[in-house]
Amino acid sequence: MKTFRWVVLGIVVVVCLLLWAQVFNIMCDQDVQFFSGICAINKFIPW
């Protein structure tokens, strides 16, 4: 039962990361000033 909990937790983390990636892409497309520095770093991360 414990392993099942870890699997669910892992899936939730992956989904959250994917959602973050989508938000980052949208923000970068909008060229939000606050995100400009993060977007520069984000380009080097293969999503």
UniProtKB/Swiss-Prot annotation:
Subunit structure and binding partners: May form homooligomers. Probably interacts with the periplasmic domain of PhoQ.
GO biological process, one term: negative regulation of phosphorelay signal transduction system
Organism this protein belongs to: Salmonella dublin (strain CT_02021853)
Protein name: PhoP/PhoQ regulator MgrB
Its job: PhoP-regulated transcription is redox-sensitive, being activated when the periplasm becomes more reducing. MgrB acts between DsbA/DsbB and PhoP/PhoQ in this pathway. Represses PhoP/PhoQ signaling, possibly by binding to the periplasmic domain of PhoQ, altering its activity and that of downstream effector PhoP.
S-S pairs: none
Top-rank taxon, per record: Bacteria
Pfam families: MgrB (PF13998)
Entry's Gene Ontology cellular component terms: plasma membrane
InterPro entries: MgrB
Keywords: Cell inner membrane, Cell membrane, Membrane, Transmembrane, Transmembrane helix
Family statement: Belongs to the MgrB family.
Membrane topology: Single-pass membrane protein
Membrane-spanning parts: 6-26
Gene name of this polypeptide: mgrB
